């Protein structure tokens, strides 16, 4: 039996990676690097929640109107031309994500995407536990909240977006609380996931650690 690294490099093989972790833990950068390294499609599951949030705002649907939000989640269509990387949208999306019916509806979309995409790395909060429990490789990325807030602050500044570091930190702490305490698919690593704390590691070092792990797992 071939090791995971060999299988991942073989583009004739189906290969799925689940990449979970809290906000601003470095998942995006690491996910893109792994996708490029192994020629995988990269998909952020948070996009479906951000799209739903954008749709609620544009259609003037109050997120406290649970029935309306649930109904909208059943007919989600992604618009790849939108810029959904907005802290306000992200904060509202994390509130919508705790609605169990919404999460179930959007997870159906994500599960179908994984099943119909032969080679994919999907990033999110519950990919390894719910969306792709049979993934070839499951990774859980974490980091200190202060480090994560600083990373997000620098990302937003680089994009020319106004932001305040302390506000970002408070949003991250609140999002962590919501993610960990929600009744449906709370944020936690799969029992067989590789867990990496990126607080003191560069993205390159993390990818190297993952690649080494893949060499010894079959």
From Swiss-Prot:
Q: Give coiled-coil spans as residue ranges.
A: none
> Where along this sequence does the record place binding of ATP?
21-29
This protein's GO cellular component annotations are:
cytoplasm
Q: Supply the enzyme class, top level.
A: transferase
Q: What is its EC number?
A: 2.7.4.25
Entry-linked Pfam families? Cytidylate_kin
Catalyses which reaction(s): CMP + ATP = CDP + ADP; dCMP + ATP = dCDP + ADP
Gene Ontology molecular function, alphabetical: ATP binding; CMP kinase activity; dCMP kinase activity
InterPro entries from the UniProt entry: Cytidylate_kin, Cytidylate_kinase_dom, P-loop_NTPase
Q: Which UniProt keywords are present, listed alphabetically?
A: ATP-binding, Cytoplasm, Kinase, Nucleotide-binding, Transferase
Per UniProt, subcellular location reads as: Cytoplasm
Which branch of life, at top level? Bacteria
Q: Which family does it belong to?
A: Belongs to the cytidylate kinase family. Type 1 subfamily.
In its UniProt entry, what is this protein called?
Cytidylate kinase
What organism, scientifically named, is this protein from? Answer: Rickettsia canadensis (strain McKiel)
